[in-house]
Structures are given as C-alpha cells and as structure tokens.
Amino acid sequence: MSGNQYTEEVMEGVNWLKKHAENEAFSFVFKCDNVQLNGKDVRWNNYTKPIQNEELTSLIRGAQTAMDQTEEEEMDWESEVDSLAKKQVQTFDALIKKCLFEVFVSKNIEPNECVWFIQHEWGKDQGWHCHVLLHSKNLQQATGKWLRRQMNMYWSRWLVTLCSVNLTPTEKIKLREIAEDSEWVTILTYRHKQTKKDYVKMVHFGNMIAYYFLTKKKIVHMTKESGYFLSTDSGWKFNFMKYQDRHTVSTLYTEQMKPETVETTVTTAQETKRGRIQTKKEVSIKCTLRDLVSKRVTSPEDWMMLQPDSYIEMMAQPGGENLLKNTLEICTLTLARTKTAFELILEKADNTKLTNFDLANSRTCQIFRMHGWNWIKVCHAIACVLNRQGGKRNTVLFHGPASTGKSIIAQAIAQAVGNVGCYNAANVNFPFNDCTNKNLIWIEEAGNFGQQVNQFKAICSGQTIRIDQKGKGSKQIEPTPVIMTTNENITIVRIGCEERPEHTQPIRDRMLNIKLVCKLPGDFGLVDKEEWPLICAWLVKHGYQSTMANYTHHWGKVPEWDENWAEPKIQEGIISPGCKDLETQAASNPQSQDHVLTPLTPDVVDLALEPWSTPDTPIAETANQQSNQLGVTHKDVQASPTWSEIEADLRAIFTSEQLEEDFRDDLD
C-alpha cells in the first residue's frame, strides 16, 4: 500500500513519532486506589467535586471533546462505559496535566520545551490507571525520583480537593498521607544486580508509543476487558484519532523503523556472566595506562616529564607509591609483549630526515668503516637480533680494547629502545632483577660469568626462564634481545680457579660477534639519539628487512662467531663535488647500480700532463677513502677502466695543450 492512500492525520502521527523516536523519556503511572476512612468508602470515581478553577475547567472540557469525538467516529461498536466513569477520566486527565504544568513551573521549564503523551487505561486487576511519558532536554535522568515525589504531592493535593465524599479535615489529611505513602504516582525503574538499588529507567519516546500504547484496544466493557479510554499528547496528534488509525500509525512506524539487516549474535557463557561495575578510579587508571603506552613511558622519570598531571593524581591517592609502581609495570609489560626492540626504534624515525640521511657517514657506520667492514651487513645483522629474528643467536656482543666505540653504539641502541633492563653485576644473588618485562637487556662491561653461566646462556639464547627477584617470588623473563659490551674474553668461563672449556662453544653460538679494535679519536663524540632510528628506517626502505630469511637472501648465510664482516665488500668510488646526482642515485639503491667511476678534476689534470707509472692499475683501487658508498659488491660491478685506457681516450679527443688549458681554467 503506497503512502498516498493514508490520511494526512495518519502520516502526521507517523512523522511525529519518528521525530521523537530516540528521545529518552520518563515513564510515570498515576493511579487512584479505593480506600476506606472511618467507615467511609472513597472509590476511584469519587473525585468529581465541582471547583471554581477556569484553567481546570478548560482542561476538562478539552478531554470531554476528545473522548466524544472519537466515540462518534467509531460506528462498529457502542461503548457501555457509564457516564460517571467517563466524567472521572476527563477530570483525571485535567488533574494530571495540571500536575505536569506545576512541575514545569517549579523547574523553570517552559511547557512548549517538553514533549508528553498521556493515555488513560483500564485493567481487569489494576482498575483505572494513567500512563504519562515526559521528555525534555532540561530534565536529566538523575531528577526522575525528584519529579515523582513532586507529582505525587501535587496529585494527592488535587485528589483531596476534588473528593466528592464528605470528609472531615482529619480524614482529608489521612487520605493525602495514604496517597503519598502508597506512591499513587510511580516511575519506571530497574534494580541493579550488584548494588540492589532501584534506578530510574528511561524509555524511547516514539518507540514506546508506537509499540505499546497505540496497539491497545478501545475500552468497551469495563468489567469484561481491558483497554484505553483516552489519549492526549503535546503535539495534538492522537487526541482525536480513532482506533483503526492508531493501529495504522503503529504498523507504518514499525515498518519504516525496521532495520535493513538483522544481525544474529551468539552470546557465549562468558558474556552471560554477571557484569561488574567499573569505579571511577578504575576508569581513570585505564585511561592513564592507554596514554602511557601510547607515549612509550617506561620509567618514573619519563612519566613525570610526559604525564605530570596523572603522576601527581596517583601519587596523591592512598597507597600512591604502590599504585604508580604497578601501573608502570603494566605499561612495560604491554610494550614487552606487543612490540620488539626493532619496532620501538623504528617508531622514532623522522621520515623528513630520511631522504637526506647518509648511512655511510653516520657515526656508527664510520666505526665499522674504520675496520674495513660492510657496514650495511653489520647493521642488518644487528637489526635482525633486535627484532628477535636471530634464532639462538640472540645477543649482540661488542668486544675489544677500550675507546673503540663499543659502549657508545650500545648506549645509542638502548636509548632508542627505551624499555631497557640493565644487568647488575654487583648484585651477586639477583643480577637480573631489573630485566623482567623489557624489550632489551643491556649488559655493560661483562666479565667472567662464573657460576651464573647457565643462566646467562639461557637469556642470551632467547629462552623463557624464571629468575629470582629480591623480596619477591620468581618471575618469568620472556625471549628478550641482549646487547653486551666487554673488554674481556667472555667465552672463557672460570669457576673458582678452574676453567670450564665446555661452555666456550655454546657461548659463541649465542653471540653476534662484533670485535672493535680501532681506537677512536678524542673528538669523535657520541652517537646521536636520532641515528639508530634512521638506520633502521634506511634498512627497511632499501629492502633490508629485519628477518633472518631476508638476511640470508642478501648475504648468503646466517652470521657465525667468526663472521667476516668485510665480505662482500662495498665498492667505493671517487665522486666529484659536481656529481651529486650520481651520489644520490647510488645511495638510494645500493644493489642495483652499475657505474663506471669518474676521477676528480685534479687527478685528471695530472693524468693529462704527466705519464702514468702504473698504466694497468684500475681506478677503483686508487679511489678516495672518504667517498660515499655505492652499495654494490665486486661481483656486481663492471670492470673499471685502467689509467692507460683513460689516457688513450682523452688524447684521442683533446690535444695536450687544450687539455692543460681547460683544466687550468677550471682550477683557477
């Protein structure tokens, strides 16, 4: 049936309900019980005493008009409701509206700011009662019980005023006390499972009317059935609507508000368990935890600097010190279980600086270049261990003489990770007390393992073990990368005066051996805190993923204790200051370039003016040691031209005089 076949009155009713469909409303019920006072029966229909109140009289006439008009339009049946009951319903309708208006005045609310619906009904057991739905933006759920008490007071006062039974002043006071104490005005509530208290329950205004009130039948026989007498509302949509149109409005509203798809949900036994109320303190702690994890706070000092407000708030609470400690422990546990050390470092990379970042000239790679190593290979191996992809080789060992850069590299990595636990050699009984729930374990200046060798081997291989903590029970250490620096040979284990050679090879199998022997100059400085995040980002950008499968793809095999970090060599060429495009291209794709190297301008001048003593020496062997890396191995680069070949090409194009004059001009 199309929409134009319905009356305008029906469509207006549907639209009005849809407009207020999701408005939350209070649900009140007014009633009037039969009572007996000193032998005098006061029934529900004994409140029709005439009163000189023009406003009340006008409201009664409006209710009478609405009831008479709806009955005239219903031709299928004839109402058998007696006139006394009708008159009483009309009076009650006026009294209820009067109570509502008095509440609005007490709360300084304009009546036109409220939406209400009133329906008088008759029940076989309950008798007469009236449902009232009330919605206003100025009324909050917390005021529901106060509204009920106010309406109950006004309702009892008006009932005493309009009672047609001849009562003494004492009996009138008693009637009012009964009405208030027995709660002749109630509000819809629900009982909480935990607190066992009643709380006001809000209903959806439009849904409640369409699904519940409009589906009820018109009352015909008060003694035989239940139904409604009269409905009125603030929008004047259902005051004069007949019974059939009310059902039509309910049907149309239900069809239009029906969801397009109905999702079937399966409730598990765990979900059906009784819920638990979260206190404000719990909610505050959870919000603080989310902030701490998002900002990677791992120490009380970081918390004081990054989240001072939440730190002070918790510190001021009873038991604040323990609360701070436990909250921080949950934060570090979350980071340790959900992130790897490599991921924490990679998060801190500034992508705006990555474009101009030169890996070869970073301080870390300068240290590796002093040893003639393939610095990309070394950084790639370290990244795999930090990402927990090194397998049993779970420890990066920097060892060698003093002042060779071991500690500054380890310190830079530890600072970039943040969530780091330190081994305490001075605490003989509990050396790993600080190493639980960490993303990296830092062992500075490691010495003889002694009786702790088995515990060291388990941690260095990335096993899950339990350790003892001071003043606490044992605690589990999950697989955690280890970074270690030392000046000694840690593969030699001494227990007392006895050397234990059976531990040498197992220790080597667990270490990524990086031996630094070149002493750094005094002005070398520290590694910048932004360097290692950029190194990790550079590796990812250029295809060096931090997995052992990717490592073996690039370098042929997994690293060993005696790994030759110099192979495969990185071809370094002599790049003139004017060849910036070539330098950028080589740095952006270290494995795909195949360049013929070009000598610097002064070298070309010397080549042009003087004969070469070593005509068969390739250019690559006399390249400047400070040129940028090209990222390719010897086997990937074409054979470099010899000096004699370059001489022949130049002399074929230029004469000696022209070549000398041109290059002299450039140098001047």
Swiss-Prot record:
It comes from Feline panleukopenia virus (strain 193) (FPV). This is Initiator protein NS1. One of its GO terms (cellular component) is host cell nucleus. Multifunctional protein which displays endonuclease and helicase activities required for initiating and directing viral DNA replication. Also plays a role in viral packaging and transactivation of several promoters. Binds site-specifically to 2-3 approximate tandem copies within the origins of replication (Ori), unwinds this hairpin region and nicks one DNA strand thereby initiating the rolling circle replication (RCR). Cooperatively binds Ori with host PIF and probably other host factors, which activate the nickase function of NS1. The active site is at 212 (for nuclease activity). One of its GO terms (molecular function) is metal ion binding. The lineage of its organism: Viruses, Monodnaviria, Shotokuvirae, Cossaviricota, Quintoviricetes. Phosphorylated. The endonuclease active site can probably bind other divalent cations. The keyword Transmembrane helix does not apply. ATP binds at residues 400-407.
